[in-house]
Amino acid sequence: MVRWLDEIDLDPSDPPVRMGVRTLGDQSWLLQDDEEESQLALKAKLTKDESSEVFLALPESEAAGLEVCSLITGTGRQLIPDSKDLHPLKRAGLSVQEDLCLMRRDEGCWVLAAASLCFPSRWRLSEKIGREISDVHGPVTGYPEFLRKKVNSLMDRLSTTPVWRRNWFIHPDPSLYQPERPENGDPIIEAVHVHDELFLRRERQTLRRLHTARWI
């Protein structure tokens, strides 16, 4: 069994809505696997072909982006060469397999202020940039009732020591770049075709406060 599969709850019953946040401990916040070369190539292609859909940043996000670059090089990883007008978060995002998002504390709420997002699971960065976190998670079932206050509290309490969580989805499409949510829902897959027409998609998320004031 794939190692990460042991880390997610696959209870067939209706699971409780929860964040599932854990301490990262000695684990690295960045991972590398045998898909690194192909995924970095896909990121570069998406950045060229879908530029405004995979990277956006609000003004005054450069300092936080530079800190992310420092966090990456602090692990021994190398960044792609710098160039004129290259936002530091875009540079960081093109250097690692992970997508990278910056949240800023603004007027009592956390706002999505910048993101290098090449592998979205059915959401568009252009529709979420500049919006508070509860709006970003708007389509998530049970979020307003069960998670909104907990997520805001977690964000406020985050330290520079990272925590992590897992997400998982079942989609009829293995593509990493999936910005569209099916308007009429997913097609019904016959049981005999489930093994080759449905795909388990997982996300490993780490969260931390930056030293740059008011940023995560």
Please state what every model-predicted region is:
Residues 1-216:
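Extended, well-ordered protein cores
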